[in-house]
Amino acid sequence: MGQVTVYRDTAVVLRVTKLGEADRIVTLLTRRGGRVRAVAKGVRRTKSKFGGRLEPFSHVDLQLYTGRNLDIVTQAETLDPFVPVLAADYPRYTCATAIAETAERLTAEEHEPSLRLYLLVVSALRALSETRREPSMILDAFLLRAMALAGWAPALNGCARCGEPGPHTAFHIPSGGLLCAVCRGAGAVGAARPAPASIELMAALADGAWPVAESAEPAACREASGLVAALLQWHLERGLRSLPMVDRLGEFAPIAPPSVFAPIARPSVQADPESDRSVGSGGSDGTVGAALSDGAGVIQAADLAVPPVPIVIDSYATVDAPDRTPSGRAAS
């Protein structure tokens, strides 16, 4: 980028990192440009022109210009005030942190357009800030749909290996979902046997069937969350730093994904170009991020026609979270 170019884009701040005495590097997931890292000069000064608009989870409209190594943020305006609500609520804060970290991990290349992921992240943060749904369910719905966007949608109806229609009882993380009896006996070491209610919950979260999801028992919620976390860890090849801190259904209980996986080749997932569902559209109606939140939070398929463009990204845990005691209760 030899020539300086000024451009505008909307973005979610995923992460911030200190730079020198007054600056920050912000990692952004932009609507048109994917993941971008940029410098916000003077943002840590008391009288900074950016105020608090470049904190993690901020949804902002930005003006930037291209730099030699990093772009430079010159203007920032808040689009959605997610930060105050999320920073004041520990369960929602930790879920937002996991969402931001996942989004950054799924965008390996900078300036690679990731419009669907951007829309999904905005929808998830909006749902968290509206405080109408259980935050851990919103997180699991986001993770399932984000994995589907990456081509890693778990097999929750048929066999992950041969496609034999279910119901099946064995769930094998390395194979990518449920296995029939024949495939389970063909070297699927370490397959779990989750309760049918847990699989039903995962399918409901992936499809946006919130009445079904919200009627699930706590035991099914915890088991489904463990399976989702283990699937994500398998595909990313290491766990998220933020996920063990997520407050599950009001109980501060870090998730411990299975540590032993069978030495089986990863499944090759082929996306069907004719099906939005194959790329993790999220809802049976073809919307991306459908039912993560209602109203403005639902992303319509028409939004996907927007041409992709650059983005900016960096750290995700700089906003002060509420103090937490070892028992998981907020400190008084």
Model-derived features: positions:
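Non-catalytic alpha-helical scaffolds and adjoining flexible linkers that form interface surfaces
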Residues: 1-277, 285-288, 294, 298-332
